[in-house]
Swiss-Prot record:
Keyword annotations from UniProtKB, A to Z: ATP-binding, GTP-binding, Nucleotide-binding
Residues involved in ATP binding: G12, L13, T14, G15, A16, G17, K18, T19
Gene source species: Synechococcus sp. (strain JA-2-3B'a(2-13)) (Cyanobacteria bacterium Yellowstone B-Prime)
Family: Belongs to the RapZ-like family.
One Gene Ontology molecular-function label: GTP binding
SUPFAM superfamilies: P-loop containing nucleoside triphosphate hydrolases (SSF52540)
Protein name: Nucleotide-binding protein CYB_0992
Keyword tRNA-binding attributed: no
């Protein structure tokens, strides 16, 4: 077992678990410093590292001034071989966590907590790209978080986290996508009245879409690219890759392709046998699904016999929309 690095720097979204991560690292013997502006990290580390076996530092990134200091810090930690960890979680999970703890959001809540969450995610996207490690805490309890952190600080190889994101071009392109596919040329279920109110998660809609040869060919090309690119991303020790698929609204075509990819890549998530992708951790995010459903509801009215989408905004993600559900 390799020696734990003396320093771990942590950034992340509000509600993603930075405080909990610090607590878990303290139990692993780390001395912690919380809410430190990036410009103060280097002098603090140089002053403290001779007196402390290991340091865990979480950053204060609320102000643009502090975020502008990250490139200098990122270059330094890379030169020192120090892990720079970004903690994140799906937006519905952050919404539930912050609501349950009645915790104010640093980006304000005048326009709503959901908007504050999305504003912070956008603001921290450049910071996220500077990090060396990423950890989605959406489905982790305290013990699992500690295990992940322990694996990181002990240098245990981690799986490549492949985040599959569906989105709607009408709502904007995900700013953190490494690979992006435009599938607006595929048959549009919106123009099929019996499919319009469904989503790409519904078997009936998937059956309609994948009956089309162009859809099948497009899907196979994307799947083949993932399998072909994966060894090269692993070779450069990239721990996180975001693949985004977009259609017009992010409710039908892109969602269906992401769901099928997650299903077909699932066998590769567990190390076994001769699997081509033995250490791939697949995560799914339907970024604009809920936005699109709300728009359809406003245009055509709620589906008879069902509660309005606006009343389901917390329930829907838990029923299978694993990420910032919007269109």
């Amino acid at each position: 077992m390799s020696v734990a690095p003396p320093v771990l720097v942590i950034a992340g979204l509000t509600g993603a678990g930075k405080t909990l991560a610090i607590q878990q690292l303290e139990q692993l013997g780390y001395t912690s410093l919380e809410g430190i502006p990036p410009a103060q990290v280097i002098p603090l580390v140089e002053a403290m590292r001779t007196h402390h076996a290991a340091l865990a530092i979480s950053l204060n990134l609320h102000a643009q001034e502090y975020r502008d200091q990250v490139p200098t810090l990122a270059a330094w930690v890379q030169s020192q071989g120090i892990p720079f960890l970004f903690l994140e979680a799906r937006s519905p999970v952050l919404l539930n966590r912050l609501s349950a703890h009645r915790r104010p959001h640093p980006y304000g809540e005048a326009a709503g907590l959901w908007e504050a969450i999305e504003q912070e995610r956008l603001a921290l996207a450049p910071v996220r790209e500077r990090c060396t490690h990423w950890l989605d805490t959406s489905d982790l309890n305290a013990q699992q978080l500690r295990q992940q952190l322990q694996a990181l600080v002990q240098g245990i190889p981690q799986p490549l986290n492949l985040r599959l994101v569906s989105f709607g071009f009408k709502y904007g392109v995900p700013p953190d996508a490494n690979l992006l596919f435009d599938v607006r040329f595929l048959p549009n279920p919106f123009f099929q009245p019996h499919l319009r109110r469904l989503t790409g998660q519904d078997p009936l809609l998937q059956e309609f879409l994948f009956a089309d040869p162009i859809t099948q060919s497009t899907y196979q090309h994307i799947l083949s690219l993932i399998k072909a690119f994966w060894p090269h991303y692993r070779a450069e020790r990239r721990p996180h890759l975001t693949l985004a698929i977009g259609c017009t609204g992010g409710q039908h075509r892109s969602v269906a392709l992401v769901e099928r990819l997650a299903q077909d890549l699932q066998p590769w998530t567990v190390p076994a046998g001769n699997h081509v992708l033995p250490d791939l951790n697949v995560q799914v995010q339907h970024r604009h699904l809920l936005d699109s459903q709300r728009e359809l509801e406003a245009r055509f009215g709620p589906v008879p016999g069902e509660a309005g989408v606006a009343q389901q905004q917390v329930r829907i993600p838990l029923a299978g929309v694993p990420a910032p559900s919007h269109a």
